[in-house]
Swiss-Prot record:
It comes from Sulfurisphaera tokodaii (strain DSM 16993 / JCM 10545 / NBRC 100140 / 7) (Sulfolobus tokodaii). One of its GO terms (molecular function) is RNA binding. Pfam families: Ribosomal_S9. This is Small ribosomal subunit protein uS9. GO terms for cellular component: cytosolic small ribosomal subunit. Belongs to the universal ribosomal protein uS9 family. The gene is rps9. Keywords: Ribonucleoprotein, Ribosomal protein.
Length: 137
């Protein structure tokens, strides 16, 4: 009977973006929507997704393979959701309270999330808050 490999699955949301992260023991490869992380064109997005790996250290990041699937929302919302899912997966994979504490001190939203949503547009207005100017005379 073959030994089943350990797979950790986590889920995260940011604004309208949703991300699922699958972590398995491996060689340190990270894929976002089946594209290697190294060839993602926007450097800001690439660095944001890499933050949990850099904080975890070379030993942990080189011993796992991560596949992140992101959908919905905009580019930075997707990056934040992917970062959060990856950080949660690394904490779950290692079972380390120290790593969890490092993430909380660095940026609490890596684990806890950010519940803010965009405010919806109201009727007879141009946007959520903007309205026609009122004239008194």
């Amino acid at each position: 009977m073959s030994q089943q490999s350990q797979v950790i699955i986590t889920y995260a949301r940011r604004k309208m973006a949703r991300a699922r992260c699958y972590i398995t023991p491996g060689k340190g490869r990270v894929f976002v929507n089946d594209i290697p992380l190294e060839i993602i064109p926007m450097e800001v997005v690439r660095m944001k997704i890499m933050e949990p790996l850099l904080l975890a250290g070379e030993k942990i990041s080189s011993s796992i393979d991560a596949k992140i699937y992101v959908e919905g929302g905009g580019v930075m919302g997707q990056a934040d959701a992917a970062r959060m899912a990856l950080a949660r997966a690394l904490v779950k994979f290692t079972g380390s309270k120290e790593l969890e504490e490092i993430y909380k001190v660095y940026d609490r939203t890596m684990l806890a999330g950010d519940p803010r949503q965009t405010e919806s547009e109201k009727w007879m207005r141009y946007s959520a808050r903007r309205w026609r100017q009122k004239a008194y005379r």
